[in-house]
Amino acid sequence: SKKSKESREEKQERGEQLMRKMGIIEIADNDINEVSGGQLQRACICRSMMNRPKLLFADEPTGALNRTSSNEVMDELVKLNNEGTTIVMVTHDAKVAAKCGRVLFIVDGNIKGEYTGLKEITDEKERERSLNNWLLDLGW
């Protein structure tokens, strides 16, 4: 069966819901030069979520952001993941990786290790410490 066509109004409403969820509805009409890096990243996440994907690829989603904006973007990605969207993310930032439920350490395209022990740890600092210890054990 064919997917039902969504009306322009339905798409508009979903876009506004996503912007509210990401905390950027107030910048919806702003020029791109008038928004912060964190707001722009959240706008990109909104755009990628418009078609309700089951899987989202995020390549360094916090790479060019300050720590505050990075935390905001990661908080939104964690929420999306908790709502059922699988997220495959590339990052070189251990603080960012510590927010993930499963971490693969990849060198030259080869998986050198997999860590899933973060799921049970609720304290953010303890998650970071646990991941850093695992990375040290791998020689990183």
Regions flagged by a language model, labelled:
Residues 31-35, 39:
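Conserved ABC ATPase signature
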Residues 52:
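Conserved catalytic motifs of ABC-family nucleotide-binding domains
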Residues 9-27:
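Conserved ABC ATPase "signature" region
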Residues 48-49:
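ABC ATPase C-loop
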Residues 71-83:
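Helical segment within the ABC ATPase nucleotide-binding domain
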Residues 45:
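Hydrophobic anchor residue at the start of the ABC signature
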Residues 56-59:
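Catalytic Walker B motif of ABC-type/P-loop ATPase nucleotide-binding domains
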Residues 110-136:
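Conserved beta-strand-loop-alpha-helix hinge in the C-terminal portion
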